[in-house]
Amino acid sequence: CEFEGSKKNNIILIPESVAAIKGDPAHTAVFKDANPDCPADARYKCVIVGKPHGLYLLKSADGIRFSVATDKPVITQGAFDSENLAFWDPVRKEYRAYWRTFTAGTTDGKTWAPAGIRAIRTATSKDLLTWDSQADVEYVDSPPQQLYTNQIQPYYRAPHIFMGFPMRYTDRGWSESLMALPGREDRLARAKASPRYGTAITDGLFMTSRDGVQFRRWNEAFLRPGPRRQGSWVYGDNLIFWGMVETASTLGDAPNELSIYAPEDYWQGEAVSFRRLTLRIDGFVSLRAPAQGGELLTKPLVFDGGNLTLNMATSGAGSIQVEIQDAAGKPLPGYTLADCPEIFGDELARVVRWRKGGDVRSLSGKTVRLRFLLHDADLYAFQFVPYQPDPVRPRPGK
């Protein structure tokens, strides 16, 4: 778009380009439509807030030049004053949307009187035009918390699982600890416009779901405000971007990692900074055991595959062992803990090998349980994969 007489910029939308729907470019979410039946001229979509009150859709063939796809709002019940997004669910073959709402009060476009908790609402659609099954997102064993955004997406390595990275909003009020934070004078100046601009702090959370409505939300921050420095510990920072990218590690031949991004310096000058953050693939949470040990017994499960792999990390003295049991909890011959040599290292897909090898094809399709015994170790994920023969190892001293 042209800005101040020049097109040498990265601006995709300006108010004039969405004037027909009185669109707000500050409240948009662009996604590449993964629906295989999506027309080529609408491969990219943009969810945008407009008037009359609601969410509208833009479309584009290249993700750069957008046009209005709906001249009427497709979703009207919500606050929409933050991030609102949609995507194609490849497992359930439908679109799903998540948007900003409040649990009480009125936010209908005519009256702005929000109350209750800043919350997330969701719905599904076959065509992006008619949205059904609207519901507020629910949480298991998590107290009420103010969530500004949602950043929900299917995890690309396990698309049946939804992952979200909402920004948590906490108003700490005026206190000695708040006044000891960096940028005190700026904080006091912002508070003249609105007290919460000085007293609120935001950080990033992590949550997952298998149905898109009921989420397991970890109450501990996934992204903390970090070390004290100028411009930190403010309202608006630590908003994890929507999406993640698999990137090469900077550590030589180490495996790929995940890159996520978040803004910093939200109130510093006229622009914000973006920071890249990295973590191991699947490394969002882990089953962690101390040196004295700990264990996990899974629910009964049925698998398809020939080998069991672990995304795991241990200390030099740590270990993991795996036992396969039948549905009643009886260890299966050849797959007991005693049959499993200690596994140690740090890998994304270590094959579990018992004394007789790693072949589990004879158990495929049967109901089993897995027992994990850990010492000073983390287990991030496990997966059954197609069978590969055991490697031929050299014999020490030969």
Model regions: which residues?
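Carbohydrate-active catalytic/glycan-binding domains of CAZyme proteins
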Residues: C1-K398
